[in-house]
Swiss-Prot record:
Name the record gives this protein: Lipoprotein signal peptidase
Catalytic reaction(s) noted: Release of signal peptides from bacterial membrane prolipoproteins. Hydrolyzes -Xaa-Yaa-Zaa-|-(S,diacylglyceryl)Cys-, in which Xaa is hydrophobic (preferably Leu), and Yaa (Ala or Ser) and Zaa (Gly or Ala) have small, neutral side chains
Gene that this sequence comes from: lspA
Upper lineage: Bacteria, Pseudomonadati, Pseudomonadota, Alphaproteobacteria, Rickettsiales
Gene Ontology CC terms, in alphabetical order: plasma membrane
Subcellular location: Cell inner membrane
Length: 197
């Protein structure tokens, strides 16, 4: 029990720096558009030929998906997103590589940023709009970017780890090499704690 509590504390101490930083960046960007610039829905700022800043409230999930179900979705999304964040945090505690730890931290940071919007404002504020000729990408925010980055990190980490396992199965790595790689991962980001088994 003590070891579990210790691991929970260590994971929280390390991940909170990343997560809180991402949440602050996300919320400051939204505050700047909503309160400081005092924009109103429908206003648009053309930044480049393919990038606009727009004022949009998203009543669905990331990138505006499922917004047509808003009349009964906000409470459901609040509960669902909270449960997802808790589950992701559980997975992060069990993470065995720096890549998965960082990936989960980014996804959680982005999810919490949007969760704050939904809890206090009833919807998520989106303002980044990419478009090219007749193609228009759904409007999103920095929290969505963090989630996407986190997913990319997790995918890359999964395939990197899978490659090492496959190479070991083929006999290309011996146990000493595997342990050396594990030790390198531990020392790189976890100060020697037993994150990699």
């Amino acid at each position: 029990m003590f070891l579990l509590l210790k691991k929970l504390y260590i994971t929280f101490a390390r991940s909170s720096r990343i997560i809180i930083t991402l949440v602050i960046i996300d919320q400051l960007s939204k505050w700047w558009f909503i309160d400081d610039l005092r924009w109103k829905p429908g206003l648009m700022l053309k930044v480049t030929s393919f990038l606009n800043m727009v004022y949009t409230w998203n009543y669905g999930i990331s990138f505006g998906l499922m917004r047509e179900y808003y009349q009964y979705s906000n409470a459901i999304f609040l509960i669902t997103n909270t449960l997802i964040v808790c589950y992701l945090y559980y997975l992060m505690i069990r993470s065995k590589t720096i890549g998965s730890f960082a990936g989960y931290s980014f996804v959680i940071g982005g999810a919490v940023g949007n969760l704050i919007d939904r809890f206090f404002r009833g919807a998520v504020f989106d303002f980044i709009h990419f478009h090219y000729q007749n193609y228009s990408f759904p409007v999103f925010n920095l929290a969505d970017c963090f989630i996407t980055i986190g997913v990319i990190i997790l995918i890359e980490d999964y395939y990197s780890t899978k490659k090492v396992i496959e190479e070991k199965a083929k006999g290309n790595y011996d146990n000493a090499q595997i342990e050396a790689m594990a030790e390198k991962i531990r020392n790189a980001g976890h100060n020697g704690d037993d994150i990699v088994n």
